[in-house]
Amino acid sequence: MRIHSPAIRYFDAVRKAGSIREAARRLNVASSAVNRQILKLEAELGTPLFERLPGGLKLSSAGEVLTRHVAIVLRDAERTRSELDALKGVKTGRVELTAVEGLSADFLPSVIGRMLEGHSRVRIKVVTAGSTTIPALVVNGDVDLGLAFSLPRNPELHQLAVGRFRLGAVVTPNHPLAGRKHVRLGDCADFPLIMSDSQLSIRALMHPIIVHSGRPITPAVEANSIELMKNLAEHNLGIAFMSRIGLEKELSQETLVHIPLEDRGPVFTELGLYMRANASLPVAVDAFVQVATAEIHRRAKDEG
């Protein structure tokens, strides 16, 4: 059932693919059909939506304006289909979300597993992104939901759930600091440090701690990957800084130790679940929200 113009769907496909031919392949239709719909849409709007470049198609200024509207239309269409299916007792639908990399280790597999137990016909798409990228993906309607740590307040985002987690130093069990109940950044400064770059929210959390430490802090390694930072720490190449989320396997196998960080008191990071402000959630997405919210609250409670 189509409840919107094919031109809308074709425009979105071309935007994502970057070419008419690739969009047609993904849609399983003829290239001429896609091109015809794009030309028709441009004629109706009276402006080019794409710049035709040798390397492919690039959104024009008008195309960028239309993109957000199209994403919202497609989301609303999915919500309507989901609600109609729910009236018929059909547990189908699609959930698209973006999440920070650290949630891929254990959190997301747990949530997705519980979701599919009760909604086996729901399809889930996950896009991994940095904390600085996630708000735009949610606001622009590219995804239904975002999961990220310590996002700044944004009037275009609505926070559905939040949990607080201790930020800590991550080291091997034989590290000189491993036996501490807590550490300050100054305690860690005598060892090689593994720091996140500005793409991860941890960087912003660490900045005032670095200032308060009163010591020059020069990381041995900067990275935009939690997985890499974790692996570097596991190879005993330095001290990484993160929450316990994403370290579940290493902590249970005792290959890494998480030591709570102190800076004028405990240091916390917040894991939040977000949607676009004033949006309506399809039935399947709402079900996912309930499962993810329960998991966030459970883990925050276990954190103590």
Question: How would you describe each model-predicted region?
Answer:
Residues 42-59:
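A short LG(V/I)-centered, amphipathic sequence patch enriched
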Residues 92-155, 222-223:
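Central regulatory/effector-binding core of bacterial HTH transcription factors
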